[in-house]
Every structure is written in structure tokens, then in C-alpha cells.
């Protein structure tokens, strides 16, 4: 089939050429077998022999390696770090006259270095990126508890150090002193997670932080929303509870969730004016925000949920104290009005009837320094039994007459005189 398209003379010429080549090859092989030097290959002279760049010796082997424009024995081309024989490798790398394998070259001279171990990162290796830093997968761990962080985990960074969410929030709150042992922190965190766990379903994680409802007890699960104050609520109490000078910074204390070997000073957090305004505006609507509301407030104010929980806890306590104080003040005012304008069977009528009894001896007291003052007539009599429970100081404030601003009032009576005298106005 091969010679079918060729003419007769061309076929004979090809066959003759093939026969000549076979005869010449057989002659060379026979000459080599006989040891005839006239037909052997010329040997390399000693002056022109190549030198190995590894050992410096002459290369007399049939095969040798050429790398970095130099000749090498097959046994001499090795990595200077791990001594790996590069004879069967596809690539090798050179730096400052030294030969490296691929792994050692990227480890030592790679442009991308791990921010944790400061070693090189090869181009085929999987990495974790945080901001402008690159980490090995095994190096992307929490600095405190050495927990490996994977895709989807929440973490925080401070000074190029990586923290898990639990320890980063604790670091922001100043829970740990600088000399605190990492092993102790890990043990304390594990114990705290077993004792108190809060449901963070909307965040997709479990976080060991308690929820405080302002009373001092730990509330499990989602907190119950309290009713927001209606339009008829006491606005004066609310304003008194949230009264704060805008020029002053408001501070709050936090409890330490983890036990410490040494007593450390609590850190105090100062709020900015726009943060205070945002929190106060929301407090007027809802005194007890839930986790979703706290998340929205955290995004608006830039504060953590824990800080917001403590602030609302303190605001609720202050609001309740002011309500109790105003209720007590209202009760006192009501009792004063009852004593001054009492019913005929009340203490005031008994007091007036006793003062007008014939057995009393009237005496007149006048202020010599101010003749324009009204005359006060006192009657020596015994005080009824239902007035003995009233304190002398309170009775003095209720029964003394009012004086003009131009003249000073007379000197107050001693508490002992209130049990002997009764004051009436003429």
C-alpha cells in the first residue's frame, strides 16, 4: 500500500537507499564489537569536560541535568532545605545561587505570608482572608481559646489578632486583665456556657451571655415585651428618670461574668450624645426591647448588645425609683391637704374645738421687729390623742402662717413646744 502510488524507478531507488543504511549500520556495530577505534564515537577531551555545579567534579555520565544554565550530576541536583532529589521533579527554583524545591521556595520567599505564623503561602493553598490579611486555614484561630474559625463564624479583630465572638465582646468590655491566662479563660468560658445559655436563633449561633431583666435574676429564653407607656403616663417621672446634661458623659458599670484570680477595677463606658439620644428616644417607646430591637439599636449606635442591655436595665431601675419617689410625694401632699381642710369629725375640727374651750388661757405673741405682721394668738391646751402620731417637725410646717418677703419670719418653735401649744390664726 505504501509504494502503490510510486513509479518503478522511484520504488527501486527507495529500496536501494534502505539497503545501504542497513549495511552501514551493521558495519558500525561489527566495528564496535571488534574494538576498532577508527569507527567509534569521538570521546570528550579532558579540557572540554563539563563541571558539575553541585559537587564541582567532572561530568562523565552519559546523562546529566541542565538547570539555571549550569550542568549537574543527576545525584547532585537537590533542594538545599529539605535535601529532596530534584531529578524526577518537573520544576526547581533558584534564589541567590541556591536550589529549592517548590514547597520550600514558596514557604521562604512567597509574597503572600500568613499573618499568624509569618510563613509563605503557596498559590495552590486554601487561605482565609480578614480585612487585608491572609491566614492559613489552620492558623485562623481565636487568640484566646485557639478555636478554629470557619466560614460563617462571627469573629473580631484587634491589632491583627483574631478573636471569636465570645472573647472579642469580653475584650471590648474589659473583662480580662492583660495578664490573664488563656487556659483559665477557656475553662471559665466552658463553665459559663454550661451554666447560662441564651437562644440566639436569629444570629445562627449560641452565645453564653445571660439576659438581665432589671430585677437581678436570669431570665431564660426570649424576654417578654412589656407594655409601652400610654399617652396618659407620668411624663414628669420619665423626664426625671432620663434627665441628663448633654455636656456630661453618662457611664455605666458592668458585672464580671467570669471569675478572676485578682480583683480588677471595673471598666466604665462613656456614651456619645447621638447614642444617648437614640437610646432615650427608644426608651420612651419601649422600656424592655427584645433581641431583635437590640440588634437594630446596635446597628444604629455602634454599641454591643450587652452594653445596650445594661443601659436599659439601669434606665428601668431609675424610672421605677422616680415613680416611687413621686408617689410618696403625692401621698404627703394629700395628707397635708387633709390636715388643713379636715372634716368636722377630723383632727382639724378637734383642734379648733379644743382651742376654743373656756379652760384655756390665751396669750398674745407679736413680732416686735415687724409691726405689720399679723397677730398670732396661742392657747395653752393639751393636744388631742390623734395628733400625737404626727411628727413635731411636720406639724410645724403645716400650721405656721405665711409671711411677706419684706420681713423675716419669727424664729421657729422647738419640737417640745408643739406638745404644749396650739397655734390658731386671728
From Swiss-Prot:
Residues 264-323 bind DNA. Its main location: nucleus. Residues 14-42, 248-268, 326-370 are annotated as: Disordered. Found in discrete regions of the developing CNS, primarily in diencephalic and telencephalic structures and a subset of lymphoid tissues. Also found in embryonic spinal cord and fetal liver. LIM domains are necessary for transcription activation. Acts as a transcriptional activator. Stimulates the promoter of the alpha-glycoprotein gene. Transcriptional regulatory protein involved in the control of cell differentiation in developing lymphoid and neural cell types. Interacts (via LIM domains) with CITED2. Interacts with POU4F2. This is LIM/homeobox protein Lhx2. It comes from Rattus norvegicus (Rat).
Amino acid at each position: 500500500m505504501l509504494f502503490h502510488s510510486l513509479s518503478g524507478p522511484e520504488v527501486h531507488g527507495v529500496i536501494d537507499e534502505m539497503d545501504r543504511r542497513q549495511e552501514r549500520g551493521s558495519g558500525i556495530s561489527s566495528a564496535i564489537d571488534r574494538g576498532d577505534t577508527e569507527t567509534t564515537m569521538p570521546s570528550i577531551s579532558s579540557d572540554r569536560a563539563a563541571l558539575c555545579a553541585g559537587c564541582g567534579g567532572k561530568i562523565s555520565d552519559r546523562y546529566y541535568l541542565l538547570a539555571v544554565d549550569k550542568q549537574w550530576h543527576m545525584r547532585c541536583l537537590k533542594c538545599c532545605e529539605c535535601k529532596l532529589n530534584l531529578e524526577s521533579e518537573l520544576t526547581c527554583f533558584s534564589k541567590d545561587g541556591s536550589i529549592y524545591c517548590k514547597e520550600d521556595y514558596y514557604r521562604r520567599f512567597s509574597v503572600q505570608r500568613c499573618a499568624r505564623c509569618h510563613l509563605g503561602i503557596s498559590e495552590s493553598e486554601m487561605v482565609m482572608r480578614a480585612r487585608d490579611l491572609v491566614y492559613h486555614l489552620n492558623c485562623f484561630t481565636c487568640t484566646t481559646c485557639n478555636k478554629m474559625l470557619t466560614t460563617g463564624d462571627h469573629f473580631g479583630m484587634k491589632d491583627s489578632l483574631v478573636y471569636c465572638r465570645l472573647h472579642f465582646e469580653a475584650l471590648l468590655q474589659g473583662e480580662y486583665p492583660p495578664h490573664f491566662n488563656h487556659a483559665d479563660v477557656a475553662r471559665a468560658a466552658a463553665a459559663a456556657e454550661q451554666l447560662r445559655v441564651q437562644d440566639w436563633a436569629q444570629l445562627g449561633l449560641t452565645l453564653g451571655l445571660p439576659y438581665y431583666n432589671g430585677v437581678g435574676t436570669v431570665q431564660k429564653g426570649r424576654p417578654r415585651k412589656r407594655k409601652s407607656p400610654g399617652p396618659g403616663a407620668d411624663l414628669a417621672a420619665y423626664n426625671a428618670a432620663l434627665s441628663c446634661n448633654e455636656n456630661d458623659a453618662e457611664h455605666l458599670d458592668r458585672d464580671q461574668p467570669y471569675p478572676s484570680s485578682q480583683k480588677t477595677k471595673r471598666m466604665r463606658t462613656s456614651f456619645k450624645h447621638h447614642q444617648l439620644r437614640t437610646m432615650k428616644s427608644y426608651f420612651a417607646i419601649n422600656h424592655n426591647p427584645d433581641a431583635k430591637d437590640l440588634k437594630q439599636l446596635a446597628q444604629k449606635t455602634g454599641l454591643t448588645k450587652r452594653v445596650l442591655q445594661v443601659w436599659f436595665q439601669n434606665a428601668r431601675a431609675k424610672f421605677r425609683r422616680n415613680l416611687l419617689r413621686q408617689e410618696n410625694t403625692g401621698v404627703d401632699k394629700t395628707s397635708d391637704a387633709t390636715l388643713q381642710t379636715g372634716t368636722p369629725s377630723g383632727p382639724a375640727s378637734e383642734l379648733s374645738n379644743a382651742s376654743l374651750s373656756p379652760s384655756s388661757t390665751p396669750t398674745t405673741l407679736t413680732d416686735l421687729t415687724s409691726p405689720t405682721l399679723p397677730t398670732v394668738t396661742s392657747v395653752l391646751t393639751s393636744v388631742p390623742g390623734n395628733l400625737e402620731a404626727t411628727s413635731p417637725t411636720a406639724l410645724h410646717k403645716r400650721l405656721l402662717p405665711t409671711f411677706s418677703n419684706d420681713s423675716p419670719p419669727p424664729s421657729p418653735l422647738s419640737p417640745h413646744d408643739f406638745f404644749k401649744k396650739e397655734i390658731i390664726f386671728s
